[in-house]
Amino acid sequence: MAFDPLLCRPILHSLPSAFKVNLRTARSGHWLENSILHLVDEAGSGQAGSKAVLAKLSEVLFVDTLRRYIAKLPDREVGWLAGARDPIVGKSLTLLHSRAEHPWTMAELAKEVGLSRSALLERFSRYLSEPPMTYLIRLRLQLAARALTATGRGVVEIASDVGYESEAAFNRAFKREFGLPPARYRRKQRTEGNNS
């Protein structure tokens, strides 16, 4: 599972510091217990391919545990995971993440999820503590930051790819979010990456 600290930040902030899974009461406790035992055996085996097995099995266990955690969240819980579970906010998040470059408006997003603008604004903000368009701006900038560090594409192209029509507007928004203009951010990230 690819881990991008910038894009995963909202999810990570919604997680508890530890998960507790009761194997005796979990519906698939037997499967979980056997998987954990296999993980422990695999870690000590030193066999060819054991790193790949450990990575994939850990990923499956994490996703399964995360699903259980989300399913048991109280109805009044807030945060990214609780929002993702809500049918309206979850659909909004899916739309924004799958088409971040789209020139979304509150009216269009509200129409897509079947609510009025004010109802969507209230519901989205209740779960995520910010309005959908603010969330979208941050998402676009995080996607741009990832592209700046992972590719050699130009700033103008990246700005366009994440939904900015104006390079100047992109540069201002990026600097406001990350404290540096995009080109300097790229150089800094690459320099820090080379020093690690």
Range-by-range predicted roles:
Residues 1-40, 69-72:
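A hydrophobic/aromatic-rich effector-binding and dimerization subdomain
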Residues 91-98, 103-110, 115-116, 122-171, ...:
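Terminal helix-turn-helix DNA-binding modules in bacterial transcription factors
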Residues 19-27, 43-58, 62-102, 107-113, ...:
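Short, Lys/Arg-enriched, Trp-marked, Pro/Gly-tolerant hinge/linker segments that flank
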Residues 13, 34, 41, 82, ...:
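Charged/polar, solvent-exposed surface patches and flexible loops
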Residues 29-32, 60, 154, 160:
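A generic short-segment signal for beta-strand/edge and adjacent turn/coil regions
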Residues 36, 58, 141:
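Short amphipathic alpha-helical/adjacent loop interface patches that line ligand
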